[in-house]
């Protein structure tokens, strides 16, 4: 897809994608069939270049940017952000709310299946380290999609470099997913679950340690968090 050039007037007409479209790096707006993320004004050109430098991988579950977005200028066009596909399905917040109100029937087994059969294998294959993963960034439809892709670590074998996350650490990211599973457990049909919650948590920690080369401190934080959870 070609780069996108918008006038100042056109940029002011863009509609936010949600009630809370802003993050550390920018704000997301609807544009045609996708989303434009416009950088915050306080970001320097170096910050923008650093963010964009690793947005060059393709994955079936990660919504990578497809085009750069420029604001038209009289003398020079200015880089303002990037364009990416729109995530399909419900994010985990919307899914949880539908479960709580009885509008959707999702079992704990289905969540486990999505995690084990689709989520982890694809991340391992692409060698992606999660960055700012939380309920608002994980979408479920027929597939699982991840947004906020400027917050990942990507191993690039071609140049033997790991591009670092701009946000967050592993333990923060995984904790958000734990919180979702735990807070919603009473609404899931757990009678047919093959794995207990304790086993699920242990396996997640073990799998994350395989996917990432994270430090001992990060894994210790995960284990300390596990011990602090009350399962009853």
Question: Can you describe what each PLM-predicted range is?
Answer:
Residues 141-232:
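C-lobe/activation-segment region of protein kinase-like
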Residues 120-141:
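Catalytic-loop of the protein kinase fold
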Residues 34, 61, 82, 145-148:
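Protein kinase-like catalytic core scaffold
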Residues 1-10, 41-48, 212-232:
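Regulatory N- and C-terminal appendages and interdomain linkers associated
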Residues 107-124:
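Conserved alphaE helix
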Residues 30, 86, 139-141:
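Conserved hydrophobic "DFG−1" position in protein kinase catalytic cores
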Residues 62-112:
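Conserved structural core of kinase catalytic domains
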Residues 11-75:
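ATP-binding glycine-rich loop module of kinase domains
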């Amino acid at each position: 897809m070609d780069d996108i050039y918008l006038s100042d007037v056109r940029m002011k007409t863009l509609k936010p994608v949600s009630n809370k479209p802003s993050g550390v790096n920018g704000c997301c707006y609807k544009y045609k069939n996708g989303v434009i993320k416009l950088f915050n004004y306080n970001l320097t050109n170096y910050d923008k270049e650093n963010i964009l430098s690793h947005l060059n991988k393709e994955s079936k579950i990660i919504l990578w940017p497809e085009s750069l977005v420029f604001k038209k200028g009289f003398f020079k066009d200015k880089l303002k952000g990037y364009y990416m596909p729109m995530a399909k399905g419900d994010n985990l917040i919307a899914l949880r709310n539908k479960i709580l109100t009885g509008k959707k029937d999702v079992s704990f087994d289905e969540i486990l299946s999505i995690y084990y059969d689709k989520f982890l294998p694809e991340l391992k294959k692409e060698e992606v380290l999660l960055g700012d993963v939380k309920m608002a960034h994980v979408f479920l439809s027929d597939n699982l999609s991840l947004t906020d892709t400027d917050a990942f670590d990507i191993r690039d074998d071609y140049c033997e470099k790991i591009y670092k996350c701009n946000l967050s650490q592993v333990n923060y990211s995984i904790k958000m997913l734990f919180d979702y599973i735990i807070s919603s457990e009473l609404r899931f049909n757990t009678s047919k679950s093959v794995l207990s919650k304790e086993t699920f948590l242990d396996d997640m920690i073990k799998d994350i340690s395989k996917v990432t080369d994270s430090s001992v401190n990060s894994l210790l934080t995960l284990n300390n968090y596990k011990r602090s959870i009350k399962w009853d």
